[in-house]
A protein has these predicted regions:
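A structural boundary/capping signal
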Residues: 1-208
């Protein structure tokens, strides 16, 4: 069975706060899937291949937090995907400190990033992403969010070292209970993001 090296586990042990885990996630190059093959890599594969996209970074972040007493949670942010208006979903790692929620996030953009633990509940945390969640032409697209998915309770104890893609996690995030953020009437009245916001949304951390 494949396992983490001792020095890797020691490095994880040093990441004692969510902020330090986020710094570590930011240091990992972004996975652009340049060979055209979709992946959902395990934390072990992320380290071996030294890249991660959104859900891969989230799974790694959840695993590292679990080593420090946090449950390994994922939260699915679901975007509009009907008709001509289509956007990407996002996955973050909710964590709770002193009764308040924050989130880890692996993204290549200046938006949809780490959230400090200052939010009273999951919905409040989710809504902090709402105004940053828009297409290149400024249409706001965040529509639903899931209940937190506990990887430790839902999957066997090898998910973090799997050599196979973790499509089961991706599929479970789609299946679990979701909550609508707003009504159709409210959606119809949404204002476009400002030009300067759209320009900021084009800033990237890693180049292809």
């Amino acid at each position: 069975m494949f396992e983490f090296f001792k020095d890797e586990l020691l490095e994880f042990k040093k990441l004692k706060t969510p902020a330090l885990v986020q710094d570590f996630l930011n240091s990992i190059p972004f996975n652009f899937e340049i060979d055209g093959v979709d992946t959902v890599k395990s934390p072990l594969r992320v380290l071996r291949e030294n890249n991660a996209h959104c859900i891969e970074g989230a799974i790694l972040g959840a695993y590292i937090l679990s080593l420090h007493g946090h449950p390994p949670l994922l939260l699915h942010l679901e975007a509009h995907k009907k008709g001509k208006l289509r956007d990407w979903d996002h996955v973050v790692v909710p964590f709770k400190i002193d009764g308040l929620w924050g989130a880890l996030s692996k993204t290549n953009h200046a938006v949809l990033r780490y959230r400090e633990p200052v939010y009273r509940d999951i919905r409040e945390l989710v809504m902090s992403y709402f105004h940053e969640y828009f297409t290149d032409d400024g249409k706001k697209t965040l529509r639903r969010y899931s209940v937190p998915l506990n990887l430790g309770k839902t999957f066997d104890d090898t998910w973090h070292i799997s050599q196979a893609d973790l499509w089961g996690i991706d599929e479970e995030l789609d299946k679990i209970k979701h909550f609508d953020i707003m009504s159709k009437q409210s959606i119809a009245k949404l204002r476009l993001a400002d030009k300067i916001e759209r320009e900021a949304g084009q800033i990237v951390e890693w180049k292809k």
